[in-house]
Amino acid sequence: MPKSPGRKSNPAPGAYRPHVAARRPGGRHAIRPAFRVLVHHKYLAVWNELPDRVGLANAQQFWDHVAMTPGQPPKVGTSSIMKGKHNVPKWPGYSKTIHYEITGAARIDYQYNRTATEGTHGDPHGVVKIMSIDLGSH
């Protein structure tokens, strides 16, 4: 199959990775995160818009929570484990879906794995995958 103009090469089989790094709003944290925070690429634009919608401090508090202690109740905001078909782990080794509410202005669903071996090196590390972001009101 010929390559498209401007395309460098065809992707390798299995190279599709839908999650990308969700950078901390406002810049890096002084403390190295315990978990790598990833967001599905279809929510990346919404993730980047989050500080403008909920405030920089609220967006940073969410990121700090999931990057450090995703399985514990947050210090600010509320979280709950979802019920029904949406709570089932989407990937082997991941938690049930956690629903985090930021000041009533946004809801973010995520799952985490303390010892994920995904990635190029295959070394165990903590990963949080943001599955959905809703900036609408209830």
What do the predicted segments below correspond to?
Residues 1-106, 113-138:
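Basic, Lys/Arg-enriched alpha-helical interface segments
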